[in-house]
Amino acid sequence: MFATLAAPPMTADEERAVVQQQSGVSDTALDPVWAFVHKYRTQASDANVGLHKARRFGTRQLIRIARRLARWPDDDVYRLLFRNQLCDFLPRTVRDIVHHMLLDVGIVPHGSEGAFQYKPPLRLSAPVVEAGTLAFFDESGKPVLRVPRYDWRTKDPEGASLIPNAHGSFFHNTQQTGLMHSIVQDLETLDEHLLLMGAQGTGKNKIMDQVLELLDRPREYIQMNRDSTVGELLQRAYLEDGQLKYADSPLVRAIRCGRVMVVDEVDKCSASV
């Protein structure tokens, strides 16, 4: 009754055409990334190398990186690819393999290009809120990124109490400001979902709350645990006047009102959830 259609994998030329069509990246910016991806996939197919346990490099990830390079051609491609493959969490030997593959295709970290090609690492001063925008400047005062703040007064007046407020307890440094700059790029400009990974107590929630406070974005929060279920993600039960009632979960409210959804301890719940 039903015809069987076999979809063959894309050729290299077809995949490159899709990436450029979806991102608008130039050939100059894509060439070194494309060379690394081809080399990475070839090495990852060899079980003796050790990359088979690392993160795969799919077309969707390639499009995401290409969109970022199309918007910011001078971005640190080395750090972008290194972070995309979660190399900081890989064994040292596998991390070194990725590092040498990047060097082989001419992708080096900013600050190590050599004479006449030196690009200093981006060092940012504390972000500034001015005229309804959030602005990032480098240490010389040159503007790096400027995004409009969220107009919650007209779009979500009920979410005013959900905007984080650190009450001046957040202190900026170059590393944290650089991380917030990258989060704002992905969250506000490229409209990407984010996964923050790191050791316990490194301030992931603190940094995320500070970003949302600077952007004036209301946020919903939910914390996962090993007993979390799909039903808890959709609605919550509570007792009122002796009656059991159900209300929308923070996830549903975030979707309905267009708020940022922060899911904490996501690694604690089961894979099915």
Walk through the language-model features, giving the residues of each.
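Conserved AAA+/SF3 P-loop NTPase catalytic/coupling segment centered on the Walker-B
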Residues: 1, 12, 230, 256-273
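Conserved alpha-helical scaffold flanking the Walker A/P-loop in AAA+ ATPase domains
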Residues: 181-186, 239-262
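Conserved beta-strand position immediately N-terminal to the Walker
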Residues: 5, 193-194, 260-261
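Alpha-helical lid/collar subdomain of P-loop NTPases
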Residues: 3, 10-181, 190
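Conserved RecA-like P-loop NTPase ATPase core
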Residues: 2, 58, 183, 233, ...
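Conserved AAA+ P-loop NTPase core
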Residues: 162-166, 172-173, 221-252
